[in-house]
């Protein structure tokens, strides 16, 4: 059970407000995509506030048959004692784009912790294609957050999964850089036959170690992570196009590596601000879409 993770041992006390996981603090979202003759549709939608999805929209000019879904929260952020669960299921030959309405703010905490049980369970059938590109995560002072993502993917399917972690509210008051208590993220992928592909887990506890040391964040403030699960032929071609960058003048660094078991690619980027980090992720996202689907990525919205 995610709440029993070792890094949460010191955060088991109950909030003085609503109890952990009670009504309004136990969100659930299930998205099921199916193929219709003319396009992919959002055929299954189960939601429990504060997570909300209204409907799929088809605004992507590069892929007009691609359902685009924005996940909305009416809670103003993730609070102590919250328990969120998200399930995304793609049937064979489907395509989908899932994002969030805005940045995910993990509010300041004085008791317990919050989980986004991104036990996110993501399942991709044969020849399916999913872009999961949420907005950044902003952990506030003393926040504690754990997320776990379990992916089951067919060998012919493709997943583009990204996350961007901010250092905190950088421009709030005198600044909050790495003032959160805990951020833990685990990602595990397996094929549909049960074969495990890889697991990545990182735990950040700024009070227990210098996050700004060499080998961690260094002098950077924003961390971006893109996981591309795709057939080896696509991964090989994309890997040859990605050159590592380390440019302190521009405040950006990135690089790519191959995932174990020919699962795909891992792309990591560090920056001083969120915009350059997201732009670097978008560049890889665009190249991956072009490689896998042959479609282009439309220009970014001015407000994105």
Swiss-Prot record:
Its main location: cytoplasm. It holds the Pfam family UreD. Keywords: Chaperone, Cytoplasm, Nickel insertion. It comes from the Bacteria. It is found in: Cytoplasm. InterPro entries: UreD. GO terms for molecular function: nickel cation binding. Belongs to the UreD family. Required for maturation of urease via the functional incorporation of the urease nickel metallocenter. This is Urease accessory protein UreD 2. It comes from Brucella abortus (strain 2308). The gene is ureD2.
């Amino acid at each position: 059970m995610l709440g029993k993770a070792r890094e949460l041992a010191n955060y088991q006390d109950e909030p003085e407000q609503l109890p952990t996981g009670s009504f309004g603090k136990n969100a659930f979202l299930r998205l099921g995509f199916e193929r219709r003759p003319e396009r992919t549709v959002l055929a299954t939608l189960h939601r429990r506030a504060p997570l909300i999805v209204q409907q799929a929209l088809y605004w992507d000019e590069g892929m007009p048959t691609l359902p685009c879904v924005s996940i909305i929260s009416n809670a103003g952020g993730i609070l102590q004692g919250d328990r969120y669960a998200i399930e995304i299921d793609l049937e064979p030959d489907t395509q989908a784009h899932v994002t969030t309405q805005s940045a995910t703010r993990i509010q300041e905490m004085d008791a317990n912790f919050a989980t986004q049980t991104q036990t996110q369970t993501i399942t991709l059938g044969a020849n399916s294609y999913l872009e999961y590109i949420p907005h950044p995560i902003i952990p506030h002072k003393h926040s504690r957050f754990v997320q776990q993502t379990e992916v089951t993917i067919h060998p012919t399917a493709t997943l583009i999964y990204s996350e961007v972690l901010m250092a905190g509210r950088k421009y709030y008051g005198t600044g909050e850089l790495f003032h959160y208590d805990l951020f833990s993220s685990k990602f595990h992928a397996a094929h549909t036959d049960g074969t495990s592909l890889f697991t990545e887990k990182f735990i950040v506890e700024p009070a227990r170690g210098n996050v700004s040391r060499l080998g961690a964040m260094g002098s950077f403030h924003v961390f971006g992570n893109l996981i591309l699960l795709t057939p080896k032929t696509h991964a090989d071609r994309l890997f040859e196009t990605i050159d590592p960058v380390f440019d302190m003048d521009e405040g950006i660094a990135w690089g790519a590596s191959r995932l174990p078991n020919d699962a795909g690619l891992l792309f990591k980027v560090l920056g001083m601000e969120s915009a350059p980090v997201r732009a670097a992720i978008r560049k890889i996202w665009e190249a991956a879409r072009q490689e896998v689907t042959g479609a282009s990525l439309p220009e970014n919205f001015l407000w994105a």
